[in-house]
């Protein structure tokens, strides 16, 4: 093992020897008091490298007068990263799915370039003394050594490349280090998870261009992201990729049965590939209502002539809170006031649907009957309630037990999601570490979860790229 790879494998782990100070809690042994546990967690949190693989951005917050040096109402900004001890933010070039036409591709491309430019503006002009852009895992470690926060660029949705595979290299050259081939809605490259629930799969997995894009990403050293494409597209991507893949912000479907989460078959395939799932702290993917409740609510609404409404919450308004594209509109800079409301999640919502929309159309008598029936459903199938950090770590636990500690990481989907009680902004990141310590994870394991596994995969993707480029000479 060469020295550079060794450094990447230990990145995010303890600076001092793990075993000298703490040992993993074991059943039957006395657990530390809350005071001791918090003290232990604080030391670990300070020593490991903390990396979040998915933070959406709004170009309006990357200007000289309004930017991440300020404590904005955004879930991620430099003051909140510093407060929560977060070191690395993958800032996302996201473009929502649109028509598969030259006009649609052109508009998506312009939106993507505006977001690339925004991140470069932050790291090169607005705050180069506070945050730097990393293009390699080695850059991450070097910037961290300089006590700087670190930005990395991820691309959510391959839609903006249109039908021009040369744009994959252009996006790589602009700093993109991972890309998902679809978002919500089938793209020209891959089917979306939404196609599973809607019963419409445009490509039956990956398109021929999508397969070529994966090969090009492997050649360049860009990580293939499985979050958002359909299961069929993901299984095909894992099969085709010559490098380890990632799921940048997904949950466990066994614990929250939504199409955006990964089932056991996908997780096991990801493990075999050598990849990593970055378990997401988006409430709607962490904790869902039971199938029985969802079905009962749907049946009740149909009976009363009301439009369908998901009992899971968080599906409406996918575009809200995800950030502007190529236009920066005039609006007040969203600086957070000391007495203002707490940071909120993105526009997709994180609450549970209770099934009471559209009741204004009912008569008073019918509405009373509806409310009575709804109360009966609530009693028989209680709503899930808001997701907590404990619920979030349950997903980590499940994935670790199924595929091993080396294939699991952490992400938030902040400023496009969030909503988990106790971890709803970068400022609250310590609460995740504290819960991991409470569960008995060691410092080495927590380092792997927060950053070590992702950096290992990224490094291996680079190695595959170097090998493929040599073979093509």
Give residue ranges: language-model regions.
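Bacterial N-terminal signal peptides that target proteins for export
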Residues: 2-14
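N-terminal hydrophobic targeting/anchoring segments and the immediately downstream early-domain regions
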Residues: 19-203, 253, 257-473
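Histidine-centered divalent metal-coordination motifs
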Residues: 54-56, 228, 249
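Active-site-adjacent beta->alpha loops and helix N-cap segments on the catalytic face
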Residues: 187-195, 205-206, 230-240
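Alpha-helix-loop-beta-strand connector modules within alpha/beta enzyme cores
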Residues: 202-217, 237-247
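Substrate-binding cleft of carbohydrate-active enzyme catalytic domains
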Residues: 212-226, 232-236, 270-271, 394, ...
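His/Asp/Glu-rich metal/cofactor-coordinating catalytic motifs and the adjacent surface-exposed loops
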Residues: 239-249, 253-255, 260-261
């Amino acid at each position: 093992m060469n020295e550079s790879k060794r450094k990447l494998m230990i990145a995010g782990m303890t600076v001092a020897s793990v075993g000298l100070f703490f040992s993993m809690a074991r059943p039957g042994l006395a657990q530390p008091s809350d005071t001791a546990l918090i003290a232990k967690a604080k030391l670990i949190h300070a020593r490991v490298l903390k990396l979040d693989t998915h933070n959406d951005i709004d170009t309006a917050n990357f200007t000289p007068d309004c930017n991440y040096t300020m404590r904005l109402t955004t879930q991620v900004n430099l003051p909140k990263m510093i407060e929560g001890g977060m070191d690395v933010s993958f800032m996302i070039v996201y473009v929502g799915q649109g028509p598969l036409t030259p006009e649609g591709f052109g508009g998506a491309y312009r939106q993507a370039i505006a977001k690339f430019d925004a991140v470069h503006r932050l790291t090169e002009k607005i705050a180069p003394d506070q945050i730097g852009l990393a293009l390699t895992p080695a850059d991450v470690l070097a910037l961290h050594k300089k006590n700087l926060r670190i930005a990395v660029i991820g691309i959510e949705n391959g839609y903006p490349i249109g039908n021009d595979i040369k744009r994959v290299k252009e996006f790589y050259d602009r700093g993109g280090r991972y890309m998902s081939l679809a978002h919500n809605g089938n793209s020209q490259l891959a089917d979306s998870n939404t196609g599973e629930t809607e019963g419409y799969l445009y490509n039956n997995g990956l398109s021929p261009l999508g397969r070529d894009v994966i090969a090009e990403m492997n050649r360049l050293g860009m990580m293939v992201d499985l979050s958002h494409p359909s299961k069929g597209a993901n299984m095909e991507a894992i099969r085709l990729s010559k490098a380890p893949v990632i799921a940048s912000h997904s949950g466990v479907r066994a614990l929250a049965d939504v199409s955006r989460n990964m089932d056991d078959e996908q997780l096991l395939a990801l493990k075999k590939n050598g990849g990593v799932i970055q378990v997401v702290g988006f409430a709607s993917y962490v904790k869902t209502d039971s199938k029985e409740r969802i079905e009962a609510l749907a049946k009740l609404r149909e009976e009363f002539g009301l439009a369908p409404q998901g009992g899971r919450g968080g599906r409406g308004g996918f575009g809200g809170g995800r950030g502007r594209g190529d236009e920066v509109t005039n609006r007040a800079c969203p600086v957070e006031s000391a007495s203002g409301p707490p940071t909120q999640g993105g526009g997709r919502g994180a609450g549970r649907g209770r099934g009471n929309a559209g009741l204004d159309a009912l008569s008073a008598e019918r509405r009373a009957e509806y409310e009575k029936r709804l109360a009966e459903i609530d009693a028989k199938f209680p709503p899930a309630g808001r997701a907590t950090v404990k619920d979030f770590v349950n997903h980590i636990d499940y994935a670790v037990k199924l595929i091993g500690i080396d294939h699991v990481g952490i992400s938030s989907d902040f400023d496009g999601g969030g909503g988990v009680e106790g971890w709803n902004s970068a400022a609250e990141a310590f609460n995740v570490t504290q819960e991991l310590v409470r569960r008995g994870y060691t410092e080495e394991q927590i380092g792997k979860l927060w950053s070590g596994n992702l950096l290992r995969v990224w490094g291996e993707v680079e190695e595959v790229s170097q090998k493929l480029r040599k073979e093509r000479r």
